[in-house]
Curated annotation (Swiss-Prot):
Entry keyword annotation includes Ubl conjugation: no
MF GO annotations: rRNA binding; structural constituent of ribosome
Protein name, as recorded: Small ribosomal subunit protein uS11
Any single Gene Ontology cellular-component annotation: ribosome
Amino acid sequence: MANPKPQAKKKIKKNIPKGIAHIHSTFNNTIVTVSDEKGNVLSWSSAGAIGFKGSKKSTPYAAQLISEAAAKGAMDNGVKTVSVEVKGPGPGRDAAIRALQMAGLEITSIKDTTPIPHNGVRPRKRPRG
């Protein structure tokens, strides 16, 4: 007797009007995560998840497609306005913000949360010449 296949749970669509878009932009990749105000993730996207590989992941064009994909997933959950938090020095920062706006999300604020060291770790030894 064959075992019945377990039924996959249907995704419950939430209706959350406000969200936070976290853009993590490094020199190698860009990751966009849209969460509700409590921090629960509604949708996310990255260059690798879309299909970019290697050095193409670090381009502004990749960041644009990433933001559009994350915004589409957020809008499926009812998000209409987002507050943007940008972290990191990468090339996809501005392109990701513009793409969120073009996708139909209203941006209420933009905040830069890039970590800056208060004198951090000791630098490497100076080259002797």
